[in-house]
Amino acid sequence: MKNKKYLSVFNEIVKLQSKGKLADGIQDIKLEDMDEDMLKGYICSAMNQEPDTGASLKDIAKQALNESEASHPIISVVGNCSECIKKDEKELKCVSSCPFDAIFKDSQAGRIRVDADKCEGCGECVKACSLERIVDKIQYMPIVNLLKDKKVPVYATIAPAYIGQFGDEVTPGKMRTALK
């Protein structure tokens, strides 16, 4: 994952969750030089939640702690796209990069949006957004909740898309060793 700020937010969420303090400590996550709207978007997306529901971070964290299924789309647009929304849709790299026409400009809302019915989660828009306002939701919480449940066996496979998700130093060989 190239977005170091997003990864930093995710690391803070994992720390809070592992201590059992996610719901109570979620609003204490702060990043320098980041507006609250974008930070909330990063926090929500890192917990596999939608950022613009209007709910408090504490309520969103509680919902994430009880979730056992991944949601769709796996792509979120976070923060304010005011710099981009002024441009013609043909000029927007995120829109033109999507092979499924799932990213579009919502001029009324002043945002870039994801059409959940069209999005296949390829991540091309994530790579195309130089402002790091489009991120892939992290499916960590549903997996942790399934593993904790222990009512049914959990089997997992790893997709090739994991490459780069854990930093450049995590190679496929290291991943195979870790999963054994």
Model-derived features: positions:
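Generic signal for short, ordered secondary-structure residues
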Residues: 76-77, 108, 122, 158
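N-terminal [4Fe-4S]-dependent radical SAM core
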Residues: 55-105
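Short amphipathic alpha-helical segments, especially helix-boundary/capping motifs
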Residues: 70-72, 116-120, 151-156
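Short, charged N-terminal helix-start/capping segments
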Residues: 39-69, 93-94, 120-126, 160-162, ...
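Short, functional N-terminal and low-complexity linear motifs
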Residues: 62-65, 109-114, 143-148
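Short, contiguous strand/loop micro-motifs
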Residues: 81-82, 112-113, 161-166
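Iron-sulfur-associated redox domains of electron-transfer enzymes in respiratory
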Residues: 1-50, 137-180
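Iron-sulfur cluster-binding cysteine motifs and their immediate structural context
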Residues: 83-115, 120, 124-140
